[in-house]
C-alpha cells in the first residue's frame, strides 16, 4: 500500500500553487503599503509559550496541540497559532527598543489536532498581522482596514465585520463575578468543558459551540454593559475611526475569540456565515511572555479558508503562463541549439523549455498547449542552417520570423 499524507494535511501541487503565490503576493503588497515588515518564526516552540499565552483552559491547549518531548526531555509544541511565536520573537529580538509602533506580518503553517472538515485541516496556513506599541484605537482600526482591504481587492462581496470589546483586566474581573452569578443558576446544564471554564475563565463559556451552552448565554449579562470608562472610550473611538474609514460594522457582544490573550477589541470578518478572519487587541501578552508592559493588536487569516471563500464566491485566480517560450526539436543539432538558446534566455529571466522526450512535432505542440506556453518555435535542420526560425504566438497563431542569433529580438518577443 502506498504511503499517503497524514489525515488533515494536503499537498499543494503545481495545479494549485499558483493560487497561493497570487494570494501571498497580494497579502504582502498590501502589508507593505501599511508599513509592515516580514517576520519568520520556528515551526515549534516551547510548550510553555502557548500554555501561558493562549491559556491553559482553552480548547487549543487542552485538546488540539501537537506536543512532544525532545531527546533532552524538553516539552515542545508545533505551533497552533501565530501570535504567541511572533510576540516571543518580538521580545527575544528586543524589537521593543525600536521606534514604535513595530508592525510585522508573517506566513506560517499552523497545526491543530481538530476534526477534519470542509475548510478546516490539521495543518493549515495563516497570514498574520501584528502591530506593537500603541494603545490607540486608531491602530485597531488600521489593522481591521488592512484585512478588509484584502477582501475588497480580491473582489469578495458580502463581507461582514463583527466587533466587540471584552474589556481590560480591571473591568473584566468585575464582569466575571457578575457572569458567574448568572451562570451558577445554570451550572448543571452547561457542558463539562464549560464547568472547568466556569472556575478559571467564565467568559470563555460565551464562545462555547455546544447547543445547550449557546442557549444559556443568550440571556447572559454582556461585557459591553460593564466596561470601565477607559475601555468604553476605547471602543467608542474604534467605532468612530471605522466610520471615518467608511467601514461598516456590526456589534456582536458574544464575540470573545478562543484564545485567552485578547483584551479590549476583538473582531471577526464573516462571509456566508463563516468566519474567514479574526483578531483583536492583546495588551498583556508581551508582558506574559517576559517582555515589557506593552500593548499590541493583530489578526490571523487562513489561506486555505480564503481560497475556499474565493471559490464559493465564484472568483477565479488568474493563471499566469507557465512558460514564455517552448522550443520543439527535430534532430541532434537542433537539440544543441535549443540547449544554448534556452540557457541564454533563462539568464535573462525568460521562462523557457525545450523537448526532452523526443516527441513528434504534433505531440510537441500539444504539450506546449498543456503547459500554457505563450510562444513556440520548432527547430529543425532548415532553421539551424538558415539561422532563422518562425516563432508562433499561441494565443492567436501569429508568426514572427526572427534570427536565432538576435537574442534581443527574441527577448522583446517573449516580453510582448
From Swiss-Prot:
Cellular component GO terms, alphabetical: cytoplasm
EC number(s) given by UniProt: 6.1.1.21
MF term (GO), any: histidine-tRNA ligase activity
Keywords: Aminoacyl-tRNA synthetase, ATP-binding, Cytoplasm, Ligase, Nucleotide-binding, Protein biosynthesis
Enzyme class: ligase
Catalytic activity: tRNA(His) + L-histidine + ATP = L-histidyl-tRNA(His) + AMP + diphosphate + H(+)
Cystine crosslinks: none
Main location: cytoplasm
Alphabetized InterPro entries for the sequence: aa-tRNA-synth_II, aa-tRNA-synth_II/BPL/LPL, Anticodon-bd, Anticodon-bd_dom_sf, His-tRNA-ligase, HisRS-like_core, HisRS/HisZ, HisRS_anticodon
Assembly and interaction partners: Homodimer.
PANTHER family (alphabetical): HISTIDINE--TRNA LIGASE, MITOCHONDRIAL-RELATED, HISTIDYL-TRNA SYNTHETASE
Protein name, UniProt field: Histidine--tRNA ligase
Record organism: Clostridium kluyveri (strain ATCC 8527 / DSM 555 / NBRC 12016 / NCIMB 10680 / K1)
